[in-house]
C-alpha cells in the first residue's frame, strides 16, 4: 500500500505593510527557483519588498530542515503567492482643521517549498512487515506498584 508523504513546507507572512502589486513584482522573479539561487536574487534586488520575502524564504527553509530533516540544497520554491490584506486607514491633518484619509495597504505572502530529494509516496507494506515482532507472548504478567507509598514523604512527621 502506498501512503503519501509530506514533501512540502510553507511559511506564511500576514499583514505585511506594502502593496500586493509591489510584492508580486518580486515574487514573480523567484517562483520555481532553488533556495540558494533565491537568496542571491533577493539580496541583490533593490526593492523594499525583498526583505520580508527573504525572511519568509529563510523561515520556510528552517521549517523544512526542522520538520522533514531536509537539506537546503534540495529545496525548490514550488508555490509563491501574494494576496491582498486589510487596508489600514489613517487620518492626516490638513489646513483649516480638515483631515485627509490615508489608506495603507497590507498583503499576505505565502511561500511553499518542496524537497526534490524525497519521494512523494512511501511503500508501507515493506516497512510494516519488517517492523512486526516475530513472536507474541500469550501470557503477560502485570505488576502493580503500591500507589499509597510514594517514597515516604507523607509518612514522615
From Swiss-Prot:
Keywords: Chloroplast, Plastid, Ribonucleoprotein, Ribosomal protein, RNA-binding, rRNA-binding. One of its GO terms (molecular function) is structural constituent of ribosome. It comes from the Eukaryota. GO terms for biological process: translation. InterPro entries: Ribosomal_uL22, Ribosomal_uL22_bac/chlpt-type, Ribosomal_uL22_bac/org-type, Ribosomal_uL22_CS, Ribosomal_uL22_sf. It is found in: Plastid, Chloroplast. Gene3D superfamilies: Ribosomal protein L22/L17. GO terms for cellular component: chloroplast; large ribosomal subunit. This protein binds specifically to 23S rRNA. Belongs to the universal ribosomal protein uL22 family. Part of the 50S ribosomal subunit. This is Large ribosomal subunit protein uL22c. It comes from Lactuca sativa. The gene is rpl22.
